[in-house]
Regions:
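Oxidoreductase cofactor-interface core, primarily capturing Rossmann-like NAD(P)-dependent enzymes
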Residues: 1-36, 53-56, 63, 74-81, ...
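Rossmann-fold cofactor-recognition segment
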Residues: 43-54
Length: 249
C-alpha cells in the first residue's frame, strides 16, 4: 500500500497519483483527504479522511502502508509539528520506506519553507525508516503564486534567477522510487534544471503570448509585504511568502 499525504494542494502529489493510476498494474494507493474533498474509491484509489493533528486518523491512514509519500505543499503553512506526528505513527505502524518532497536551496537560505523542510529531513533520518528525499526547485506551474495574473509582474526578486522545473518531469523522476523499482538509499536528490530564468526573462516570454509587452518591476520587499497584508492574507503566511522572495533575490 502506498499512502500519499496530499494531492489537492500538492502538484507533485497529484501528478504522481495520475502516473500511478495510469499503470496497468500498481500497488494499492491510499490518499489522505479532508472531509470537504469530494473524492471516492471510484477515482481509482482509497481516500481516507485524516489529519496530521488527529493521531487516531493517522493510525487508520497508515494501516498496512509500505510506502509513505509525504507530498504536502508547505509554501503557505508550517507543517513541522504535523510531520512529527506522521513520522511517529509511521514508525509505530511499521512503514517500510519514506519518500519526502522537499525544496531545493542553499543551506543558508532565508526561505522559511526550505528551512522547515531541512528540519523535517533531519527528523526523517532520525526515524530509522529507509528514505529518499527529493529537493525540488520552484515548479513552473506554481508561477501564478508569485507573479499573479495581471499583464505585469510586480515581485521583489531583483535580478535573482531560478531553476524552474516542470511538475511532470519531477513526478516521472520520483515514480520509480515510489513504486519500488528503485531502492531508497537514505539519500537526498536535487531535482532542478540546467537553465536559470530571471523574472525579466519570464516577462519577455509572457510578452510573446500577449498583445502588449509584459513588464517586470522588482518592487520593494516592504511594499510587497504591505500589499499582501491588505489582501487579508494571514501575517504568518505573508512572512513565508516574503522569505521566499528574499531568498530568490
Amino acid at each position: 500500500m502506498i499512502l500519499i499525504t496530499d494531492i489537492i494542494s500538492s502538484p507533485v502529489g497529484h501528478a504522481l497519483l495520475q502516473l500511478l493510476l495510469s499503470q496497468k498494474e500498481h500497488e494499492p494507493v491510499r490518499v489522505m483527504v479532508t472531509p470537504y474533498d469530494r473524492l471516492s474509491h471510484e477515482d481509482g484509489f482509497e481516500p481516507v479522511v485524516s489529519s496530521f493533528y488527529d493521531l487516531p486518523s493517522l493510525d487508520r491512514a497508515l494501516k498496512g502502508v509500505n510506502t509513505l509519500l509525504i507530498s504536502t505543499f508547505n509554501l503557505f503553512t508550517d507543517c513541522r509539528c504535523g510531520y512529527l506526528n506522521l513520522l511517529h505513527e509511521a514508525v509505530a505502524e511499521g512503514v517500510k520506506r519514506i519518500i519526502f518532497i522537499s525544496s531545493a536551496g542553499r543551506g543558508d537560505s532565508v526561505s522559511l519553507p526550505m528551512q522547515e523542510n531541512r528540519e523535517t529531513e533531519m527528523h526523517i533520518q532520525q526515524s530509522g525508516i529507509p528514505y529518499a528525499v527529493f529537493r525540488v526547485n520552484i515548479l513552473m506551474e506554481n508561477l501564478p503564486f508569485f507573479i499573479g495574473t495581471e499583464q505585469g509582474i510586480y515581485y521583489p526578486a531583483g535580478n535573482g534567477r531560478v531553476w524552474f522545473v516542470s511538475v511532470h518531469d519531477v513526478a516521472e523522476a520520483i515514480l520509480p522510487f515510489v513504486t519500488g523499482r528503485f531502492g531508497v538509499e537514505n539519500r537526498a536528490y536535487t531535482l532542478s534544471h540546467e537553465i536559470t530564468y530571471s523574472f525579466d526573462d519570464i516577462a519577455a516570454k509572457l510578452s510573446q503570448y500577449y498583445s502588449g509587452r509584459v513588464k517586470y518591476e522588482s518592487v520593494d520587499l516592504a511594499f510587497y509585504r504591505k500589499t499582501l497584508l491588505r489582501m487579508d492574507i494571514p501575517e504568518d503566511t505573508v512572512d513565508r511568502l516574503c522569505s521566499v522572495a528574499k531568498a530568490i533575490s
